[in-house]
C-alpha cells in the first residue's frame, strides 16, 4: 500500500531541498519526522509538512498501520523560476533567479 503527497511550487531551490531529502530517504516515518524537526534547515520544515501530509493520506485512505510505514521515494524536481532584477552600480542591473521546487513523497509499508 502506497501513500503519496505532492508539494508544488515550493519557494526553495531544488539543490537545497535535496540536501535534506537525501538524509531521510529510506527512514521510517517517525524517525524521519523526528530527524527533520531538529534539523536547522529551511527545507526540513517544508519536507516535514509534505511527509505529514502523505502520512495523513495513508491513514485516511487505507487505514494503514502507521508504525510500519517508511519513506520509499522522495523526489525533488525543479519548478518554474521567478526572474527578478537587482540594481547595481552605474545604472546597471543583474538578474536574479528565484527557484521553486516540486516535492513528491511516497510512503510504503515494510
Swiss-Prot record:
List the InterPro entries hit by this protein, alphabetically.
Ribosomal_uL22, Ribosomal_uL22_bac/chlpt-type, Ribosomal_uL22_bac/org-type, Ribosomal_uL22_CS, Ribosomal_uL22_sf
GO BP of this protein: translation
Coiled-coil regions listed in the entry: none
GO cellular component terms? Answer: cytosolic large ribosomal subunit
Which residues are the signal sequence here? Answer: none
KW Ribonucleoprotein (keyword) present: yes
Citing just one GO molecular function, the answer is: rRNA binding
* Keywords, comma-separated and alphabetical: Ribonucleoprotein, Ribosomal protein, RNA-binding, rRNA-binding
Query: Assembly and partners?
Result: Part of the 50S ribosomal subunit.
Question: Which family does the record assign?
Answer: Belongs to the universal ribosomal protein uL22 family.
Annotated function: This protein binds specifically to 23S rRNA; its binding is stimulated by other ribosomal proteins, e.g. L4, L17, and L20. It is important during the early stages of 50S assembly. It makes multiple contacts with different domains of the 23S rRNA in the assembled 50S subunit and ribosome.
Q: Which NCBIfam families match?
A: rplV_bact
Q: Report the protein name in the record.
A: Large ribosomal subunit protein uL22
Q: Which organism is it from?
A: Desulfotalea psychrophila (strain LSv54 / DSM 12343)
Amino acid at each position: 500500500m502506497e501513500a503519496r503527497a505532492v508539494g508544488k511550487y515550493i519557494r526553495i531551490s531544488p539543490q537545497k531541498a535535496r540536501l535534506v531529502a537525501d538524509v531521510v530517504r529510506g527512514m521510517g516515518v517517525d524517525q524521519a519526522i523526528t530527524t527533520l524537526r531538529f534539523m536547522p534547515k529551511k527545507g526540513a520544515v517544508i519536507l516535514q509538512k509534505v511527509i505529514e501530509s502523505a502520512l495523513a493520506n495513508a491513514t485516511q485512505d487505507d487505514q494503514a498501520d502507521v508504525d510500519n510505514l517508511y519513506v520509499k521515494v522522495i523526489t525533488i524536481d525543479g519548478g518554474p523560476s521567478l526572474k527578478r532584477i537587482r540594481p547595481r552600480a552605474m545604472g546597471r542591473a543583474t538578474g536574479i533567479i528565484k527557484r521553486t521546487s516540486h516535492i513528491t513523497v511516497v510512503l510504503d509499508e515494510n
